[in-house]
């Protein structure tokens, strides 16, 4: 059995490397036949890697529940690949497959860490993907969504204030809201969507100095509310997203310089005012000096990454559960320990591939609202990955940010899937409009 488990980890690494290669090949090659061939390979690698991960776990657990969960996930993946392409033939096949690959990796590692959390994650993901099927049509058909910028902003702030007043505190931040005493949600994840819609809609109407000041006040109120919740990681994501959307909309480097300077000053003030920020900075500077207390989490994370080496320990062969909150904030450490450093690097490359794709979609758009919307989501997505991975590997202090589409957390999964579907709607709409224009020109000829 040990030989089989050892072989599965190398097979998963090869599959991950091959998938990553084809993901970038699709990005570079513009020939449709080459892209279609790579898509077929990527689909095969996706399902084979998913099977290999569950096969390795089944060899050690021997549980029928594992087979049922695996079968449910395969069914969902097949339905998504089938129905999304039928309903929206113009969507990005690359973005769709990358999303499913990230979800599959998340399912595997969460099943290894906590079967109950993996089941919960699966059902939430299935519902989110079902809801997401309607999002692209809504985005590219209803142009009036750009007319309610102030409503998006006010609704987002109101939701954050509600959490501040009656929310539940976890890990030092008041970011969770209990619904009917049945389950909790993290409204910040959904406010991210409202925030980007708000900024894109308002700057679509104009970028004069008066409007810039008004929108900045709106964005500042959102960030300050997150600061009062002590969700400084979330506040940082919102702040950086706004600064880059502001710069893109106005094309004035002065705004970018002032924003980044102000952000640096705000970070210094946060360090002076909040004790938990000081603790995280201390743990970042010298984790082994505080290994029994403040530095325990990051120390265990570094031990896990170092233990995994380049090729990993194999599923159920490491000790990732010694890391506090490993299923959410520090899940990248668990992946690096059991799948290996090379696998973890390929994972980062897939995230980078998604980020580049979102940026390219934004650059090709002529409609200012959709351009800002795509860019805002790209920055928000990319910066969240930077904060999550950077905190885990001790590149920056930990900010308590989850890894999109992989970490445990229903709110994060739902919001990220909706975000991807919004982008797909923009992409599909652009392809549909271009095709309609070609058909009209042919008809005229």
Regions found by a protein language model. Name each.
Residues 217, 294, 298, 311, ...:
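Alpha-helical membrane-protein architecture signal
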Residues 305-342, 362-365, 369:
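Long extracytoplasmic/lumenal interhelical loops at the membrane interface
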Residues 177, 238, 316-322, 350-351, ...:
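Re-entrant/interfacial helical elements at transmembrane boundaries that shape
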Residues 62-293, 333, 337-391, 418, ...:
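Hydrophobic alpha-helical transmembrane segments of multi-pass inner membrane proteins, especially
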Residues 1-89, 101-107, 130-131:
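Transmembrane alpha-helices
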Residues 32-37, 188, 211, 255, ...:
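Membrane-interface alpha-helices at helix entry/exit sites of multi-pass transporters
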């Amino acid at each position: 059995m040990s030989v089989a488990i050892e072989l599965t980890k190398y097979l998963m690494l090869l599959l991950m490397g091959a998938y990553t290669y084809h993901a970038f090949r699709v990005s570079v090659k513009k020939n449709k036949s080459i892209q279609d061939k790579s898509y077929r390979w990527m689909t095969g690698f996706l399902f084979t890697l998913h099977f290999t991960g569950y096969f390795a776990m089944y060899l050690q657990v021997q549980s029928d529940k594992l087979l049922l969960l695996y079968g449910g996930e395969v069914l969902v993946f097949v339905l998504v690949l089938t129905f999304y392409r039928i309903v929206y033939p113009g969507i990005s096949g690359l973005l769709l497959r990358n999303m499913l690959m990230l979800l599959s990796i998340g399912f595997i590692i969460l099943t290894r860490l906590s079967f109950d959390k993996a089941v919960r994650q699966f059902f939430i993901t299935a519902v989110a993907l079902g809801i997401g099927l309607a999002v692209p049509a809504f985005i590219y058909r209803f142009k009036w969504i750009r007319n309610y910028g102030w409503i998006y902003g006010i609704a987002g702030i109101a939701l954050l204030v509600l959490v501040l007043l009656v929310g539940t505190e976890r890990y030092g931040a008041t970011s969770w809201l209990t619904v009917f005493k049945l389950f909790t949600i993290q409204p910040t994840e959904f406010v991210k969507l409202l925030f980007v819609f708000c900024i894109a809609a308002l700057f679509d109407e104009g970028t004069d100095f008066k409007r810039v000041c008004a929108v900045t006040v709106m964005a500042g109120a959102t960030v300050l509310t997150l600061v009062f919740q002590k969700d400084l990681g979330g506040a940082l994501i919102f702040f950086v997203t706004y600064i880059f959307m502001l710069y893109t909309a106005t094309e004035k480097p002065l705004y970018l310089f002032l924003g980044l300077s102000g952000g640096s000053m705000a970070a210094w003030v946060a360090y002076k005012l909040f004790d938990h920020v000081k603790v995280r900075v201390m743990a970042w500077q010298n984790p082994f000096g505080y290994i029994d207390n403040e530095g325990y989490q990051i120390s265990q994370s570094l031990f896990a990454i170092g233990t995994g080496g380049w090729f990993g320990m194999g599923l159920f062969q490491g000790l990732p559960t010694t890391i506090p909150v490993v299923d959410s904030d520090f899940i990248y450490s668990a992946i690096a320990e059991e799948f290996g450093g090379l696998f973890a690097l390929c994972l980062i490359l897939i995230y980078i591939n998604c980020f580049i794709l979102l940026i390219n979609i934004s650059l090709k758009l002529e409609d200012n609202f959709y351009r800002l919307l795509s860019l805002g989501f790209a920055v928000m997505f990319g910066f969240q990955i930077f904060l999550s991975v950077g905190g885990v590997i001790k590149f920056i202090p930990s900010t308590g940010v989850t890894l999109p589409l992989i970490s445990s957390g229903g709110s994060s999964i739902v919001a990220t899937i909706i975000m991807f579907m919004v982008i797909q709607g923009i992409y599909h709409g652009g392809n549909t409009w271009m095709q309609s224009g070609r058909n009209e020109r042919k008809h005229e000829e």
